[in-house]
């Protein structure tokens, strides 16, 4: 304890200006480059994730393709992080593009050339100066082979995909360094990228892509003459034929009602000729609900709402009513040259059914 007191006392006895100067010189940390927890080396173009962990840009790129999560805390990496990374030192990227020597190494991208990172450039220059025919490079967790004779690079386990490389002066126009664009303009960044670990510009072209129109799933209706009509706009020929059929039905309704057998109390009900025939409805949304309400209005003639229901009604009438009181057997021609048989069945209070075909 005495030693600690003496240390504190000696520090307090120092002059004020000297303490300030020494504190500045001793405590001011030098700008050290952080180490990457993925490659276990000094970070090259360090970037900071949203979780504040720092890695090499290419190391993050390789890790994001494998798991899309931080290598330390497993927090999810945003989808657009590779296109809009958070660089700790943007000035370092510009300095790397200027280079330290006269020559630099480049790999081919879309509409331009990319400069290799500082570490990879040193490896390539060292192999080239020693006269090697090829050398291996570890980029974003993938092993690449640089063929220095044919000046191409490819993955060691995928020889089919090759990319040109070259050794050129440092001042040539370039797109960026190691997949990082020198012009970090949001308008020039395309979010659709392929899996290219070397940071090449492998953006898929989307300008020619067009939006395909949605195909309607509604099946069109078929008119009487076989032509396709829209569900919302029924065929005018079909509507006209139905109206003519019901008009003919109204004229022959009196004779049909008189010839049919009448039960007790039916004299008080109106005949179909004195009632008003409802207008036909060709809406596809309607169902057979009107057929169940015939007993409530015995004088009303039930109008069927589609040609399919009319044909089903004719087949049912042939099975349930063998003896019909009247059958006109006349078919009306429609616009397409075909014929249609319209049948309407009415129910009377005594349970008998009267079927009239037009």
Swiss-Prot record:
Residues 283-297 have a biased composition (Acidic residues). The gene is RNF146. Keywords: Cytoplasm, Isopeptide bond, Metal-binding, Nucleus, Phosphoprotein, Transferase, Ubl conjugation, Ubl conjugation pathway, Wnt signaling pathway, Zinc, Zinc-finger. This is E3 ubiquitin-protein ligase RNF146. Residues 253-358 are annotated as: Disordered. GO terms for cellular component: cytosol; nucleus. The WWE domain mediates non-covalent poly(ADP-ribose)-binding. It catalyses: S-ubiquitinyl-[E2 ubiquitin-conjugating enzyme]-L-cysteine + [acceptor protein]-L-lysine = [E2 ubiquitin-conjugating enzyme]-L-cysteine + N(6)-ubiquitinyl-[acceptor protein]-L-lysine.
């Amino acid at each position: 304890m005495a030693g600690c007191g003496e240390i504190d006392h000696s520090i307090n006895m120092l002059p004020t200006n000297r303490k300030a100067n020494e504190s500045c010189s001793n405590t001011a940390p030098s700008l050290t480059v952080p180490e990457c927890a993925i490659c276990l080396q000094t970070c090259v173009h360090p970037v900071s994730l949203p979780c504040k962990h720092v890695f090499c840009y290419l190391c993050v790129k390789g890790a994001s393709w494998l798991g899309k999560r931080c290598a330390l805390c497993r927090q999810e990496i945003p989808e657009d992080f590779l296109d809009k990374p958070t660089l700790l030192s943007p000035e370092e990227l510009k300095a790397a593009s200027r280079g330290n020597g006269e020559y630099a190494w480049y790999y081919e991208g879309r509409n331009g050339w990319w400069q290799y990172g500082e570490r990879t450039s040193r490896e390539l220059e060292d192999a080239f100066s020693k006269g090697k025919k090829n050398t291996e490079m570890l980029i974003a967790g993938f092993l690449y082979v640089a063929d220095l004779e044919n000046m191409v690079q490819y993955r060691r386990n995928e020889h089919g995909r090759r990319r040109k490389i070259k050794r050129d002066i440092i001042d040539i126009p370039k797109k960026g360094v190691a997949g990082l664009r020198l012009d970090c303009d949001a308008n020039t960044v395309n979010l659709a990228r392929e899996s290219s670990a070397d940071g090449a510009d492998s953006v898929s072209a989307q300008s020619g892509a067009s939006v395909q129109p949605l195909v309607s799933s509604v099946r069109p209706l078929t008119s009487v003459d076989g032509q396709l009509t829209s569900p919302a706009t029924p065929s005018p020929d079909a509507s006209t034929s139905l109206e003519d059929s019901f008009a003919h039905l109204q004229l022959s309704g009196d004779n049909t009602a008189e010839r049919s057998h009448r039960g007790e109390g039916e004299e008080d009900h109106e005949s179909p000729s004195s009632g008003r025939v409802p207008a036909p409805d060709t809406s596809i949304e309607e169902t057979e609900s009107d057929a169940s309400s015939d007993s409530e209005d015995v004088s009303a003639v039930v109008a069927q709402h589609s040609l399919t229901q009319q044909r089903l009604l004719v087949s049912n009438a042939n099975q349930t009513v063998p003896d019909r009181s009247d059958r006109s057997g006349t078919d009306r021609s429609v616009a397409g040259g075909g014929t249609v048989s319209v049948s309407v069945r009415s129910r009377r209070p005594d349970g008998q059914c009267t079927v009239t075909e037009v």
